[in-house]
């Protein structure tokens, strides 16, 4: 008998992992699987995620070796690709047609405001991402698509094709904010194929092909950079017309950097606040004041303006591609992707007054 096709696979370290590959199959975040009703569960203080985060998937896995990543090649002996945790959670695998049907049938109860295709370093990743994109736009045109790209395998023509096929936003996971940190965590130093120059090519192509407000860069705070370095990078992206999607460094179990400390809370809160000011409040990194250690000591705004921004809580929510409701708030709320619910770094929901007080205390050190 031919084997029954698998519609859904939940990571199981004690069973042989089935061979599942894109474009027939995709991995999705645990939050997305809960929102779609594919796995039981509830998320602390948030009912759902507003972005369906999908990963292309292959049994051979990602061929890159980024030091902080749970999907990295160096984990091959320890865990099958489909079983690897990534940004703190499991990524179940589902049949793509089943995912589309569930969303079309309203399994997300209208919660998804965006879908994101995350590419990995694999020879088939580009072509398969085109297939996933085209299928989605044909079936669910009312839910816009973002591409989290893999510049290492791409050329400018690929961006033009993605725009033609209906992608709305194109993002680049630069992650490291200096060439030195990039090289140490993603480049030759760790036997990984990524190159700083190629990533910048992709950001410049995105600015040209997708245009202002339609591209962005992922940046990770806490990998050895100063606050001045990461905020000057935010300003550079903003001046090109892009947005900055900020992630807190959290040591991923099984990664080469699993023993690194998580980002300092005060540093993270100041960077979150300054990034919001740069992206949405008309402030500039070159108008901010930094001390000798590169820490922000003045955000370049009046006290009352700064207090109103902090009180809104918005700077401390997860940053990413926007939803329909508020361009300053990310649809991609990645619940607990960089911290546990007991010590939230990126809030996947609107903050209440108690949350804001906690954040203020953290900022004050």
Where are these regions (language model features)?
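N-terminal pre-triad scaffold of radical SAM enzymes
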Residues: 31-76, 105, 114-117
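Conserved strand-turn element in the central/C-terminal portion of the radical SAM core barrel
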Residues: 148, 152, 188-189, 202-228, ...
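Core AdoMet radical
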Residues: 73-128, 141-158, 162-200, 216, ...
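Alpha-helix-loop-beta-strand connector modules within alpha/beta enzyme cores
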Residues: 129-145, 194-213, 264-283
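Auxiliary Fe-S-binding modules of radical SAM enzymes
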Residues: 7-50, 209, 231-365
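Alpha-helix termination/capping residues and helix-transition junctions
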Residues: 63, 108-109, 164, 209, ...
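Catalytic cores of alpha/beta
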Residues: 155-164, 223-239
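Generic structural signal for hydrophobic
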Residues: 106-107, 136-137, 162, 206, ...
